[in-house]
Amino acid sequence: ATILVSVAASPLPKRQVLKNLGVPKSTYYRWLRRPRLDDRPGGGPTPWNRLSPPEEQAVLEVARRSPELSCRQLAAWITDNRGFSVSESTVYRILRREGLVKSAEMQLKADKEYHRKTTSPHQMWATDASYFKVIGWGYYYLVTVMDDYSRFVLAHKLQRDMTSDSFIEVVQDAVDKTGMTEVPVADRTSLLSDNGSGYVSRAFGDYLHLVGIRHILATPYHPQTNGKLERYHQTIKQDVNQLPYEVPTDLEAANAAFVSYYNYQRYHMALGNVTPADVLNGRRAGILQRRREVQFQTIERRRRYNRTLRELATASS
């Protein structure tokens, strides 16, 4: 019963919760089909974990106010901000019933990652560039530096080309913002990039040597790839390219707005449905602990609520 409760109330996908608990899917669904004693009074089974009307209204209110959030993101946001826990699947059912479900979103997965996993912020940064078109101006290149562990975008700028000078400018911005040159050389970050001419140039190598940052080059067709940053660039393009831009400053402003949203507001599934800023600043463990507490409190409150409904139905029959 405890496992069924945990799976039903978790904001995470059912498959992920079962994997974390070490319970096979076949076993879970066999348990789910068993009649429960608590369900028998009053005739047919009544879901013990049914949301109360105020909880359903809260789900709809948040969904209508923030239509850009997916069901997964809504479930996490509600758990963090509304004092009760709700699963992604429950959010989906409520929105579908009300005709608020968006068309299926394309799930873009990161490519293979660098073979050595980072375990804390600033162990390794990644940098890459992606092109955007400005009407009448041609192509510009968004150069980004991202922290590998937290996926926090440390620096970004729209550049006219992909020369070493353009790359150095953005990396230096990340160095300045983090105070990386004040860190002992042995503890400084490394930088992962592809083999673009600007990155493999002597000027770029000399710059990294000057600031004490070790350069890691991603070998083609090798697991040392830049998948996280490539995935990020796909995501920002999906958002920013919904509108045409006639001057570079408008595109730069749109990119900056998305970066702020991505870093501080967007729940990232690969990070445990917290934001990159939460991970960068060491808040993830506390947030996940609070969610577990909210989940437990919600389970107990919802169990009492639905038991009362069953007792009232039995008494009136």
Label each region the model flagged.
Residues 14-21, 74, 78:
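Short alpha-helical "recognition helix" segments of helix-turn-helix
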Residues 23-24, 87:
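Short coil turns linking two alpha-helices in DNA-binding domains
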Residues 84-85, 89-146, 152, 165-188, ...:
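Mobile-element integrase/transposase regions
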Residues 209-213, 234-317:
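C-terminal domain-tail junction helix/linker
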Residues 188-195, 209-228, 242-248:
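RNase H-like polynucleotidyl transferase catalytic core
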Residues 171, 180-200, 221, 226, ...:
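Acidic/histidine-rich, metal-coordinating catalytic segments
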Residues 1-12, 56-65:
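Short, amphipathic alpha-helical "recognition" segments used to contact nucleic acids or chromatin
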Residues 32-124, 223, 280-284:
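Basic, flexible linker segments flanking DNA-binding modules
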